[in-house]
Amino acid sequence: MQGDTVKSTKAIDAFIKLLRSTISKSDNNEMYALANYNLGYIAFHRKDYTQASNYFQKYIQLEKGENTTALADAYNRIGDCHLHVRNFEEAKHYYSQAEQMNTPSGDYSFYQLALVSGLQKDYTGKITLLNRLVGKYPASPYAVNAIYEKGRSYVLMDNNNQAITSFKELLNKYPESPVSRKAAAEIGLLFYQKGDYNQAIEAYKQVIEKYPGSEEARLAMRDLKSIYVDLNRIDEFAALANAMPGHIRFDANEQDSLTYTAAEKIYMKGRMEEAKTSLNKYLQTFPEGAFSLNAHYYLCLIGSEQKNYDMILLHSGKLLEYPNNPFAEEALILRAEVQFNQQNTAEALASYKMLKEKATNVERRQLAETGILRCAFLLRDDVETIHAATDLLVEPKLSPELRNEALYYRAKAYTNQKAGKKAMDDYRELAKDTRNSYGAEAKYQVAQGLYDAKEYAAAEKELLNYIEQSTPHAYWLARSFVLLSDVYHATGKDLDARQYLLSLQQNYQGNDDIESMIESRLQKLKTEN
């Protein structure tokens, strides 16, 4: 093959040498003109467009005008040379010259003029020229392409309705043309882009039925698949694919994938009720499908969105049958929250413990530890509470609110476990800030601990300090007044005890057990004195 190419090249070079010899020996005669014409073609095929244009120009100057066909051809080739180097205005000039000679190649000139207008983005001008071409040369082999290019011009002008009309005209006039296959596919695509799915489906079906096995049919089936996925009508597509010519295979795995994809698209568009129906249908059809875990996960999210807690428990449970799946963490978060809010505390504790084991970041681990702490405290599991609080308190980015909560629950658990010193340490830490409810109670508990230890002076000092700094939590401040009266009674200062109780009785507005505490102590002081 390579040898043939070398021989051909040598033959052309010999021919060029002969032509140049002819030019050098002849002056302004027919042979001289023809030699320039042939040299122009050789340069053109070698893509030396500047040289080719020069030879054709020389031929036009030498040709006496008798051979109009060759002259028109030379003008066309000069136009082609300018087109190849994107010199559009010059190209149009020479194509116009060629067309005006009224030779059989005039349709080519017209067609090229139209294409150049398109390259200049003058789509209106291109359409006008194409219409004139079809009118002047109805039998032209370029007529088919002209109608197609007219349709493409309308597409580029965003005039899809006119584009569809042009493509349909092409299908009616030249149904067997390869260009008609492209036009038929374009019609389907334009309807698809307009969102006119039913028209697009019919157009694409015609492509597949009329041109089975073609590239256009393959692409039409691809777009049909996308349309049916968008419409969430996969069963229809399966039936259509199996009925279509061209040996189109649509196996169960692909139907599994497309059914899920269609449902997922509905979910992503925010159409929750429709997505729920579609995802449930997918799970019913493919209970062990490739995307069953994804479907259960999205149904969990829909359940959360719709506050359908039974739905969350059902689908999170299905997900946790495969504990190492990528959705397990989020499923546990949703599941544990529902269980906790429904006061299924032991179940919530188990879920939070699983979440802690699986947590892949600090935030989720902290969420799990917080859940474990709260569940353990509600279950009165002091040992679990102490461990959970201790784990939480070593977290590096713990918020002040969670830190206070952990210290408080641990202090309560230590108290229950008769670990008074450890409880007191946590209460003292909390008591540094009495603006929050935990600190307000803790300040009181520190004083109560001192009172219980009969350290009355220290208890009095603690309580007076509390009264001085105050707190927005009136109940614990009132309890501190009551405890201070107990301290004074224990140290023989019954008058002071009575004054604090009476003052509290007059000023405290709460509707709780403080009133009964005051009454019982005043009665006791009255009885003893």
Positions of predicted regions on the chain:
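Acidic, polar-rich low-complexity tracts and alpha-helical solenoid repeat scaffolds
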Residues: 1-529
